[in-house]
Amino acid sequence: MTKLTPMMRQYLDIKAQYPDAILFFRLGDFYEMFMEDAVTASRILDITLTSRNKGAAEEVPLCGIPYHSCQPYVARLVEAGHKVAICEQVEDPKTVKGIVKREVVRVVTPGLVVDADTLTPKENNFLAAIAVSAQERYGIAVLDITTGEFRVTEVEGREAACSEVVSLQPREILVSEDQQQFCEQLLQGASGSWLINPLPDWVCDLEACGQRLQSFFNCGSLESFGCARLPEAVRAAGGVVYYVEQTQKGVAGHIRPLVTYHSRDYMVLDNSTRRNLELTATLQDGGRKGSLLGVLDRTVTAMGGRKIRQWIHHPLVDLKAIRDRHLSVQELVGQSLVRGDLRADLDGVYDLERLNSKIAMGHANAKDLVALRKSFEKLPRILQHLDELSAPLAAGIGSRIDPLTDMAELIGRAIVEDPPFVLREGGLMCDGYHLELDELRDIRRNGKEWIAKLEADERERTGIGSLKVRFNKVFGYYIEVTRTHLGRVPEDYQRKQTLANAERFFTPQLKEYEEKVLGAEDRLFDLEFELFQDLRERVAEQGERVQRTAEALAELDVLLSLADVAHSCDYVCPTMDDSDRLVIRDGRHPVIEAMNLGEHFVPNDVEMDCRENQIMVITGPNMAGKSTYMRQVALITLMAHMGSLVPAASAHIGLVDRIFTRVGASDNLAQGQSTFMVEMTEAAHILNHATSRSLIVLDEIGRGTSTFDGISIAWAVAEYLHDNGHVAAKTLFATHYHELTDLILTCERVKNLNIAVREWNEQIIFLRKIVKGPASHSYGIQVARLAGLPVAVIDRAKEILVNLESGELAEEGQPRLAQRAGGGQHRPNPQMSLFDAAADPVREKLAALDISTISPLEGLNFLHELQKLV
C-alpha cells in the first residue's frame, strides 16, 4: 500500500501482534475485519465482503458485524478452528482528538470461549495442556474458564494419558513445541475433536512454571496444591496459566485453586472401555441418547449435568465415599416429597458456575445479574428441605450452601426485573437505588414541569407577571425580564444577555439546573453504566461464596437425579465391600431396559469371585444376548462405584479397580493397524495392566486370523488370566470357539455359561436367559436367515455345513464343500436338531404314554416329571 491512514496503520500494528487470529477491530458500533481476515470471515460467516478504497488500484477487503451481537459470529469462527482477537476502543472517542487508542482485550480460542451462551450447557469446555518426561510420565492439566475449574494429574504410560485426555474431551490442547509431534502421535486415532497448539519451549520450563503458578495464585509454595512433587503436572499447569495470561488480559481472577487428583482415587477406565460401554456417547452416532449418561442424567441444572458426566467417567474406589453416596441416594428415593420439592427448587437455579465466571471476567450483563438473584432466592428453601434429610452427605451439602441473601437483596434493590441487554442505553437500575441517578431521571422525565414551576415561583417572588424562563441552543436557559420591570429584578439575578426591549438573566439555581439538564442524557447513561459496573464488581468480590454454593448444588442435583432414576426404574442399593465377590441377582441392562424396545427385558444373574468362579466362558449364537449380558455386568459394577443404585433384585459387589473391555474390532488405517492387530493390542493392554481386583469383558478374541490361530490365542489368554496370580481378574469371556468350553477340564476356576435358545418350526427363539453349561449349537445359519440373506444362499450353506460336520473329504483330503445333496433333496440339518427324537427323553416318555389309561392325578404327576426333565 502506497499510503496508509492512521487508522489502518494502527490496525496493521495490532494485527502483527496476533498473526494467527482473526482480528475483530472495533470501529464505533461495529467490529471490522480487513484483508485476509475479511475474506476468511465473510466466507465462514456468510456475510457481505466489500472493500475500502473501492475502485482504487489497491482495494482493501472489508467486512463487519455489529458489536452488540458479535458472540454468535465469534462462536462460528472458533467452531471452524480459528482464534478471534477482540480489539476494543479503550478511550472515549468524544474526549479524544485524533485516532482513538485500541487494544486487544482478549483472544477467543476453542478452549477459551468465555461466552457460555454459545456452549453446550451440560458439558465442560476444557483447555488442556500435556507435558511428558523422558520416562513417559504425563502431566495433564485442564481448565474450564467458564466455570473456573482447574485440575491437574500425572499418569504413567501412553494408554493412561490418552485415556485421560479422551475422558476430558478438551477443545484445545497445549504442548511445548519440541513435544508437539509426539503428542499428536499419542492422540492419533483417539475419539475427540481438538486443536493442538504449540507453546515456546521456554514457557514449559519446570522452574518457570512453578514460579508462574505461585505468582498466579499468590502463594509461596505448591505444597498446598498437592503437585509440588509432580514435575510434569506443574509444567502442564504452568503452560495453561501462561496461555490464559496471554489471551485473557488479566481477567482470570475467578479461576479456582489448582486441584491435584490421582488415578488411584478412581476406577481406571481406558479409552476402549469408555467407548465400548457407551458411557456418554453411543457407538452408532456419538449421540447422548442410548448411552448410560442418557439414562442417568435427569439433572435439572447445567452444573449438575456437568457433574454427573464427571461421576460416570471417574467412578470411586473409596468405600466410605461410595457408601455415603448410596445412603444419600437411597434416602432421597424414600423421601419422594422432599425429592420433588428439591428438584422443583433446583429447576429455578441458573448456571451459577458460568454466571459467576462471566461476572468475574466483566462480561456479565444486567440480565445475568437478575438470573443470579433469582437463583439466590431459591437457596433458603433448598436449605430448608435439606434439613429434612439425615444422610451425612446431604448434611455436608447443606453446610456448603451459602444462602447469599445479602447478595440477592443487593441485586434486587439495584437491577430492574427485566433489564435490557445493552448496558449503555439506560434502563438498568431501579428507582431509589442512587440519589443522583433519580435526580437525572427526574430531570429527563419532568423537565417541562420543573421549568414551569420555576417560572411560577419567580413571578411570585419578584411580582413580575411577564417574567419568562426560556432556552436556546446558544445561550442555554435564561430568565427574561422586560425593561419596564428591571427595577424589580432581585440581587441574585446575574445578567446573561441584553436585548433591545429586555434583559436575560440566570440564577445559581437555574445555572445548576442547566448543567444538569444539558448533560442529563449522557450523564444518565454514563452514571447508570458506572453504577452497574460497581455492582458487578461488588458481586464478583463474593465469587468464592458463589463457587462453593454452585459446587454443592451440582452435587445435590446429581444425587437427586440418581434417586429419581432409581425410583422410577426400580433400582436397588448394592452391598459393597472389600471382597472379591461380584454377585448380581436378576440384573438388567440399564440402557436397553430404559429404551423400551417392545420386548420384555429378561433379567440375569452373575456370580463371580477369584476363588471358584473367576472366568465365565459364554457361548451361544449371535443376537442371543451375550454382549448385552457382559456389558450389563460391567455397567452395573460401574454404576455401583459411581454411587448410583443398580438395576437388579440384589447386588453384592466387591471393590473393582479397573474395568477392561475388548469388544469387536475394526481396522485402524490411520495407524496402519489391521483388525487383528487392533484386537491383539487391546488384549495385550489388558493382560499387562489387569489385577486381581479388575473386571474384564472379552467379547471374542482371535477372530481376525485363522481358526486354529484364533482358538490357540484365545485359549492361551484365558489360561494366562487363570494361572497368573498377580492377574487372576474376574473375566467374562464370550466366544464362538466352542473348543474353549473345554477349559473347564484344566482350569478349575473356569465355568461355562450359555444363552438359552429354543427351536420352533425351523425358527430359533432367543430366550435371553443365561444358563449353566456350554451351548450345543451356534445357529449361525438361522441368524443369517433372520438377517435377510437370500433363500438360495441359506439352503446352500446348509448343504456345506452337512459336508463339514459329516467329515466328507475329497481325494486330496480337503472338505468336500462343493458336494450337493443328491436328487435335489437337501440333507437334514444337524445344526437344527435340538430335539433329537432318538435322544430326547421327553419325546420318548410322551410317545410311550397312553392318555386313555391315566387318571387326572397321574396326569399331573406325569407333567411334573416332564417339567423336571426340561
From Swiss-Prot:
Keywords: ATP-binding, DNA damage, DNA repair, DNA-binding, Nucleotide-binding
Transmembrane parts of this sequence: none
GO terms, molecular function: ATP binding; ATP-dependent DNA damage sensor activity; damaged DNA binding; mismatched DNA binding
UniProt xrefs under PROSITE patterns: DNA_MISMATCH_REPAIR_2
Recorded coiled-coil stretches: none
Pfam families: MutS_I (PF01624), MutS_II (PF05188), MutS_III (PF05192), MutS_IV (PF05190), MutS_V (PF00488)
CDD domains assigned: ABC_MutS1
Entry superkingdom: Bacteria
One CC-aspect GO term: cytosol
Signal peptide: none
Residues that bind ATP: G620, P621, N622, M623, A624, G625, K626, S627
GO biological process, any: mismatch repair
PANTHER family xrefs: DNA MISMATCH REPAIR PROTEIN MSH1, MITOCHONDRIAL, DNA MISMATCH REPAIR PROTEIN MUTS FAMILY MEMBER
UniProt similarity note: Belongs to the DNA mismatch repair MutS family.
Cross-referenced HAMAP family: MutS
Main function: This protein is involved in the repair of mismatches in DNA. It is possible that it carries out the mismatch recognition step. This protein has a weak ATPase activity.
Protein name: DNA mismatch repair protein MutS
Naturally occurring in which organism (per UniProt): Syntrophotalea carbinolica (strain DSM 2380 / NBRC 103641 / GraBd1) (Pelobacter carbinolicus)
Lineage: Bacteria, Pseudomonadati, Thermodesulfobacteriota, Desulfuromonadia, Desulfuromonadales
Gene (name only): mutS
